[in-house]
């Protein structure tokens, strides 16, 4: 198979949702159809002993939530599928946002009882900003939920995107009978031995079912007043195809997967800082690091840099340019993933995600090129933390483990590090409380370094240039610090302290990140 044909086979997407909408469960079912697991491990608490394949970190297994993005790959129906299962918890939006820079499409999972929730809306806005296609899976039809028409209306109003139902539920909860498949023009049956039936058989099958008449009325209404189906509108991110189903009972998931792969886009190009778009079919290899993860194998204390291949082909042992440093690197020890399990890979192509063993060479956002190519891809989003804690080792004899743990976890981008300019104290910044809990858990579990964490409360953060730096500007209400890149930064007690500082030092430029 030619390189072009291989690249065109790739389908790389992220699954996004609000916590508990069933995102990890649907990921499990997709892996099941891809032949990667024998049974889908439903998400359960710590007593059951059954854990989701994509939730590999101890704290994820204990809590039943995803706090880091998993990467999984399988072959299905002539396509090579790369799934990125993202954290649903709002504290981990930074990791999720970066992950969304590495995909060509998104699958949005919605709880049929709750509709569009806060985190779903937040993540959708990022996807919309990138104009990537969104496919919607309305989940949990095995439970009682809201009316399908009401859910479609909310989706369009809240998210500002047109929708087109690919199927329609026949009943819900205990009265759930199946799906009226508009795209494949058939019925998918929830009960009984037969999986499918023709539309013509519907009247006989559901002769005594009051829901079926309502279904036919709803479909007639949608055909008269609903949006037209347009493959181009889907690819442009203007229309979301909507699928109903139940991930827990594995109903409607395979039909979704088949149809998704029919319409999901091939790998797309990425913009450089100079505004050029690198074509995925270009011969020369290029890619970018969108995530760094330490201790995927705690026994080996390893670090993996996740790279999205943008163009060309990776071959084991190839040399690359690291544009940020101007130095070269050799890609000899490279893996692909199934959550925590992995295998060495000798070649991969545009659209694929590879893991490069990292000894401290790479940073999130790094561009890799070959030959004379020295361009950089557009920077990944960074976020200003809102809450802070001082951190120190509980045992001074564990200083080495403490520093190694902090260095690796900060390089992952899971938490941000600041150092007090005058005292040298370490301060951690996060967008939510859960990040601190995960940091503490991982420091103790992965690095055997107990930590003392002292809350500092909320802070307003602004960066300044080295030229404007004057240590006399620091006070109890505005702490002068350095970030992990040694850039000077002020942590203001509140907005009032920020305004007071700006009035007192009008010539100092204060910079805000995202």
UniProtKB/Swiss-Prot annotation:
Biological processes per GO annotation: regulation of translational termination
Keyword Amino-acid biosynthesis: no
InterPro entries according to UniProt: EF-G-like_DII, EFG_III/V, G_TR_CS, P-loop_NTPase, PrfC, RF3_C, RF3_dom_3_sf, RF3_GTP-bd
Keywords: Cytoplasm, GTP-binding, Nucleotide-binding, Protein biosynthesis
Subcellular location: Cytoplasm
Domain tr-type G: 8-268
Superkingdom, taxonomy of origin: Bacteria
Keyword Cytoplasm carried by entry: yes
Any one GO molecular-function label of the UniProt entry: GTPase activity
Pfam families according to UniProt: EF-G_D2, GTP_EFTU, RF3_C
Cellular component terms per the entry's GO annotation: cytosol
Residues that, per the record, bind GTP: 17-24, 85-89, 139-142
Main location: cytoplasm
Purpose: Increases the formation of ribosomal termination complexes and stimulates activities of RF-1 and RF-2. It binds guanine nucleotides and has strong preference for UGA stop codons. It may interact directly with the ribosome. The stimulation of RF-1 and RF-2 is significantly reduced by GTP and GDP, but not by GMP.
Family classification: Belongs to the TRAFAC class translation factor GTPase superfamily. Classic translation factor GTPase family. PrfC subfamily.
PANTHER family tied to this protein: PEPTIDE CHAIN RELEASE FACTOR RF3
Protein name: Peptide chain release factor 3
Biological source species: Streptococcus pyogenes serotype M6 (strain ATCC BAA-946 / MGAS10394)
């Amino acid at each position: 198979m030619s390189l072009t044909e291989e690249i065109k086979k790739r389908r790389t997407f992220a699954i996004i949702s609000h916590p508990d909408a069933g995102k990890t469960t649907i990921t499990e079912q997709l892996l099941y159809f891809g032949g990667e697991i024998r049974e889908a491990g439903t998400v359960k608490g710590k007593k059951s002993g059954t854990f989701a394949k994509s939730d590999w970190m101890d704290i994820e297994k204990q809590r039943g939530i995803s706090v880091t993005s998993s990467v999984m790959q399988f072959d299905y129906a002539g396509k090579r599928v790369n799934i990125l299962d993202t954290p649903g918890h709002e504290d981990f939006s930074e990791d999720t946002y970066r992950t969304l820079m590495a995909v060509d499409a998104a699958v949005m999972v919605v709880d049929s009882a709750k509709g569009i929730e806060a985190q779903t809306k937040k993540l959708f806005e990022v996807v919309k900003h990138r104009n990537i296609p969104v496919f919607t899976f309305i989940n949990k039809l095995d439970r009682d939920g809201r009316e399908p028409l009401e859910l479609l209306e909310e989706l369009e109003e809240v998210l500002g995107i047109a929708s087109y139902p690919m199927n329609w539920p026949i009943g819900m909860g205990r009265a759930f009978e199946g799906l009226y498949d508009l795209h494949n023009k058939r019925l998918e049956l929830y009960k009984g031995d037969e999986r499918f039936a023709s539309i013509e058989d519907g009247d006989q099958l559901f002769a005594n079912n009051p829901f079926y008449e309502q279904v036919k009325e709803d479909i007639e209404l949608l055909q008269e007043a609903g949006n037209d189906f347009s493959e181009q509108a889907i690819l442009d991110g203007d229309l979301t195809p909507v699928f109903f189903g139940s991930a827990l009972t594995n109903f409607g998931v395979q039909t979704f997967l088949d149809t998704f792969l029919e319409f999901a886009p091939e790998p797309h190009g990425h913009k450089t800082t100079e505004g050029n778009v690198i074509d995925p079919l270009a011969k020369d290899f290029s890619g970018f690091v969108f995530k760094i993860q330490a201790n995927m194998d705690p026994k080996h204390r390893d670090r993996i840099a996740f790279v999205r291949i943008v163009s060309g082909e990776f071959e084991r042992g190839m040399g690359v340019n690291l544009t940020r440093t101007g130095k070269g690197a050799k890609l000899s020890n490279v893996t692909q993933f199934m959550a925590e399990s992995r295998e060495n890979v000798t070649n991969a192509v545009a659209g694929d995600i590879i893991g490069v063993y990292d000894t401290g060479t790479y940073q999130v956002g790094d561009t890799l090129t070959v030959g004379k190519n020295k361009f950089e891809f557009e920077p990944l989003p960074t976020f200003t933390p809102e809450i802070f804690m001082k951190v120190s080792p509980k045992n001074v004899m564990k200083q080495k483990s403490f520093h190694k743990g902090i260095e690796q976890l900060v390089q992952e981008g899971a938490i941000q590090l600041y150092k007090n300019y005058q005292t040298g104290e370490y301060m951690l910044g996060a967008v939510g409380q859960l990040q601190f809990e995960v940091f503490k858990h991982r420091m103790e579990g992965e690095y055997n370094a107990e930590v003392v964490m002292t809350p500092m409360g909320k802070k307003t953060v602004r960066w300044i240039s080295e030229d404007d730096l004057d240590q006399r500007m620091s006070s109890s209400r505005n702490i002068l610090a350095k970030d992990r890149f040694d850039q000077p930064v002020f942590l203001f007690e509140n907005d009032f302290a920020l305004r007071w500082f700006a009035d007192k030092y009008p010539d100092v430029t204060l910079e805000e990140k995202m």
